[in-house]
Amino acid sequence: MKDLLIKYGYDKTENISNEWNYVKGWTDEFPYTIQQIHGIKGAIVTMSTMCIAQRTSLDMLMYYDTRPSTFNGVFDFYTAKPLKGYYAFYWYGMFYDMRAEIRAVNEIENIYSLCGVDENGKVLAIVTHYSDNDNTENRTISVDFGKSGEYEIYLLDEKHNGELVQITDKLEFDMKVHSAILIKEK
């Protein structure tokens, strides 16, 4: 998109993706869309989108919507308690403390990642498994940071709300569709 802006003389224009969220469809599929926005699928779409956008020329990625509405996948409309989508924003916010981004070498279908390193050389990474097909099979993934270490693993899925599930030096994971892990070096 940035190349098109430059090509047509808009090189000083901000590149903004505005009012995005999960949408399966606007007619018969709309009730399904709203159900998913409030659950794990919406959260993983949000996290995967952030991972992808980080590698683009976007200047801003504007989620729709955190106001009390049907498109708010971050907070419950009535209680204001966090929904699954909250953890996508919470985890992404941790990357503001990183000194540099580390780009993934391999791209795997339906697997999205974001990785950074802080001023002490400690790694923080997110890996998501998203597909619009709810019946997609699990994926086994391995992460190699090029160094050994001990890592805290946090899980966001249907049963877990971004909580610590293990501390390990083995970075191989069997990921269900619509799940995400946060890997934090100790």
Residues covered by each model-derived region:
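Short helix-capping segments at alpha-helix termini
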Residues: 6-11
